[in-house]
Curated annotation (Swiss-Prot):
Source species taxonomy: Bacteria, Pseudomonadati, Rhodothermota, Rhodothermia, Rhodothermales
Organism: Salinibacter ruber (strain DSM 13855 / M31)
Keyword set, alphabetical order: Ribonucleoprotein, Ribosomal protein
Keyword check for Flavoprotein: no
Protein name: Large ribosomal subunit protein bL12
Function: Forms part of the ribosomal stalk which helps the ribosome interact with GTP-bound translation factors. Is thus essential for accurate translation.
Annotated region described as Disordered, given as residue ranges: 93-127
Record InterPro entries: Ribosomal_bL12, Ribosomal_bL12_C, Ribosomal_bL12_C/ClpS-like, Ribosomal_bL12_oligo, Ribosomal_bL12_oligo_N_sf
Gene behind this protein: rplL
PANTHER family given in the database record: 39S RIBOSOMAL PROTEIN L12 (PTHR45987), LARGE RIBOSOMAL SUBUNIT PROTEIN BL12M (PTHR45987:SF4)
HAMAP family: Ribosomal_bL12
Bias kind Basic and acidic residues: ranges: 105-117
Domain of life: Bacteria
Amino acid sequence: MADIEELAEQLVGLTIQEANELANHLEEEYDIQPASAGVAVAADGGGGADGDAEEEEQTAFDVVLTGIGGNKIQVIKEVRSITGMGLKEAKSLVDEAPNPVSEGVSREEADDLKAQIEDAGGEVELQ
């Protein structure tokens, strides 16, 4: 049981880039296809009034960088500090905006990340 808990902690601690690399590795090596969020919701089977209420009360948010404003270097530095990415990866993420900076975070954490990026000069949207 401790091994499973350690694995869960490692998975939760992955950066976006590391999670993407893991998904690619699982797909290439083991032919495991990542499920989209829509499929997971559909597989849940809900569909009644309860399902509608859950959709209205969003608990997980994606922090999406939509623009870099006037201070690209500061935005790249902030993205690096948030994601743990290297310089090249963070620069690519910023240059190719809109891109998610963090996914599936709480409202409070999403607001904090949004404020950090906006303070650096970036434009952010919560989804």
